[in-house]
Amino acid sequence: SRSRGLGDVYKRQDHSTWAVLPHKFEAGTPAIGEAVGMGAAIRYLQMVGLEAIQAWEAQLTRHLFARLQAIDGVRVLGPTPDQQPERGALATFLVDGVHANDIAALIDASGICIRSGHHCCQPLHRIYDVTASARASLSFTSTFEEIDRFSEELASTVAFLREHS
């Protein structure tokens, strides 16, 4: 019998045809666009050069640490770039007397995105006896000017919170 309303794609099924392993367990459309995008990203990284990326991120990280350490009441967690040159291009930090979520929200209002919370490292937070931290992450596309703007906003935010608490 004919259905009324929206168009039909499926009437009934008499049998099933299964693909061979491993394809029979893969549902839906393969991630073709994602694979093409991944290939383009890999070619771009190869063009820029992984050593150049690592060197640039190391410079940025040293600059970020210097700027954060210059702000009164900011404590950077973990080893400095001088202590661990191969460290990631990020800085996790605390601001005395201010919850990390408040710092992140206020910094966000100025158009700068940082992370706050546990960062999936609750055991480390227990060691430092803190409930949350803030984290500024860098990329090889980051600039010294962006770090300067972030650190100026952070210093301004810390001063504002001290003045109003």
Spans of features found by a protein language model:
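Single conserved hydrophobic/aromatic residue that forms the stacking wall/gate
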Residues: 1-6, 10
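A short glycine-threonine-serine/GTX helix/turn-capping micro-motif
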Residues: 12, 16-32
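Conserved N-terminal phosphate-binding loop of PLP-dependent enzymes in the Aspartate aminotransferase
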Residues: 18, 37, 89, 107
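Short, solvent-exposed beta-strand edge segments and adjacent coil->beta transition regions
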Residues: 22, 86-90, 131-135
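Conserved small-domain helix->loop->beta segment predominantly found in fold-type I
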Residues: 26, 45-99, 162
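Short, conserved charged micro-motifs
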Residues: 98-104, 145-148
